[in-house]
Every structure is written in C-alpha cells, then in structure tokens.
C-alpha cells in the first residue's frame, strides 16, 4: 500500500469519526425553550434534552377553554392530561421552574379524571420542577385528580416540589367514606401515582393538603421511592364534632363505619403517605397491563401527618423499607411481610406499627420509637399492634419516649377508631403466635388472650394473658 493511499484512508477515517462526533453532539445538545407552548411539542420526542427557562408559569381554566391542553390517555377510564410525556430516552430539566395550576382546572374538563403530569414513555428523566395547585383546598375536581402519574418503564422523577390542593370533603380524612360505600360523596385528589416497570421517584417533597393518597402504587413492578418528604395535616375528632355547619354536621357526624364519630382521636385530612395496592392498570410500550404491585423498595423517606407512613401490605414479592421515618401519623408502618430496617416513628397519634391482617407473617422490623414531636393524642393507646406469625421485631427508644397509658399490644382488640362495634371484624382482634418480640423500650407489653407461643424480651413491664408464651423481663 502506497503512502498516498494510506494518507487518503486516514483522512477519510478522520472525517467519518468527526461526523459521528458532530451528530452525537447535535443529538445530545440541550434544547432551551421559553414557554409551556414551546415545551409541549417536545414531550412526545425521543432522545431529546430539553430545559425550560426558569420562571413562573401558569395553567388556567382559560387555557383549557382555548384548547391548549387536549391530551388524553385511555386506560380503563379516559384521563385528561395537561403535560403528557410520550417519548423515550429523554431528559427534561425544570430547574428554577414553578408551574401554578389553577385548582379550577380540575373541573374544566367536565366529568373526567385529570392528571396534571403523566409519563407513558420509557427511560426518561424529569427533574427539579415545582408544581403548585393554586386555589382553595375545597376546589374539588369534577371527578378525581392526580398531580403525577408514572407509567412506562425505567423513568425517574427527581427533585420535584409538589403542593397538592383541591378535594371534597376536606378536613375529615376517611371518616365519611373512601371507596364504594360513602356517607358523604367524595372527589379525591392524590399527589403521585407510580405504576409501570422499575420507575423511580427520588428526592422529592410533597406538601399534601388534599383528601387522597400522597404517594401510592398500583400495577407497579419494582418501584423505587427514595429520599422523599411527605407532609399532610391532622385534625382532632373533637374539633370536627364542634362544627355547627358543613358536610359532616349535615349527616350528624355519622361515619361510614356505622356509628357517630368518636371523640378523642386524631385523623389525617389526607390518606396514606406511601401506599401500595394489589390491583391496577398501567401502560408500557403501548400495551395495557392489569396487575398488582410487586417488589416495592422504600428508602430514606420521611412522612408526617398522614393516615399511615408506609403501608405496603397489599404488595407482593420482596417488600423492603429502610431508613424511613413516620412522624405524627395515625399509623407508622404496615408491611404485612417483608423488612423494615433502621426505621423510626413516634406514637403520638397512633402505633408505630400495625399488623394489617391476621394472616400476616414473616415481618422483620427494627423500629426506633421517637420522643413525642407534640402532645400525645393517641386514642387507640397503642404503641404498636402485632398479630400474625413468624415475625422478628425489635423496638428501640430512650426513656423520654415513654408516655402513661400507652402500651405494645400483642393480638386482641386494636381499639382503632375504624374498628369499633364489630366493624370490619377481619381487620381486628387478631391471633398472635410463634414470633419474637424484643422490646428495648420501657413501654409495657400486653400479651392478649389471643397470643400463643410468643417469645418476648422486654424492658417494659409484661402482662401475659395468653398461652405458652415465653417471656423475659430484662434490665436496661
């Protein structure tokens, strides 16, 4: 081969690789847009890197009336979607961006459910968006609404800050209905629904002022929720009973549970902080799936003032919770089975852990009971409620956490506000057998008459009303 030919081949190779490099730069170059109108055409694109100019943007009823938001997704029901991310392998950077969404927008589509933001593509990253529902907490959707819905696979939402408002009735939690049976018809508004395959919610903050779940999972396989903060509101039932007008007053405070709202309990005005369901629908690669939630992982999340902190009892497969904290919730953790590692909760308004069903088994937990974050108002008197079998549970905490009249219950009556007068008997008065409880706190332990073959080591006083329990009082 001549020197001239070698030089020519080398030159052609350099040109070829230069073109490839240039194409790669063009493909991955960040596209900057300055309005929502400019952003929307990129939401169904693959392989784009888009940045919305920092600033405050609004979505109004007038925008809907003018036809600016026409997207919809049909999955069991039709959902109207404001921002629908249909593409794949794309990144959307919302650093410094706030989108104010008028709460009246949730009524502007008529009797359709509304999703403010939904992903149905794959391998996308959405980051650093502030979403605010702008209006009254009482501006309920015409049907129901969700701020964020994640379908598709391998998507990540990171660094979001979401303020959720607009539901009916607001201020009573689930006392007057949550599912099919209701005393007061409700229109819920949840914050974030995770579905699909291996979707990831990371380092996001939710200020929840709505009747509905904050973060929940349906038809989700291998979901990961990491580093999130959830904050709802709570309200004393005594304050509800003091009302002299309004929806609860109009039904004489008769709950969906079949009796008048009891005094002495604290209820969240929302629902669960983090919750998993055993049913649902999702769409991945254009195909619809109907299934439950499997293999959820919850890491380093904090949940405050919600009905439950982390409740994933209805999920299947491996259920793993680590480094999570529940503060001033009605209930801290309910996993059914699975692991809660290095978690913490207070029992200010309810138990740090509660068994969901009598069939629950193989629950391994390490929970530190925190000092009270505010005055105790725990109507159930439960520090923890443990039924089922084959668990290994360790409860830790310093002397400052102990409050008079509260105790760890092993089986028997939960004394829950929702389970009085024989209501939902399948959720109460459980047998408890064949597990280990290591109570390193001074809270007393009460082994009910439905406990059997439970091995207990406890710093706190033990009362044993069961059969063949193995108890050991330990000094600390």
Stretch-by-stretch model annotation:
Residues 1-30, 120, 151:
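Bacterial Sec-dependent N-terminal signal peptides
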Residues 81-83, 112-118, 145-149, 180-197, ...:
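Right-handed parallel beta-helix
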Residues 27-38, 56:
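Right-handed parallel beta-helix/beta-solenoid
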Residues 37-44, 60-65, 79-87, 92, ...:
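Short, T/G/N/S-enriched strand-turn elements that build extracellular solenoid repeat scaffolds
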Residues 61-62, 101-107, 135-142, 166-174, ...:
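Short glycine/acidic-rich loop motifs that flank beta-strands on beta-rich extracellular proteins
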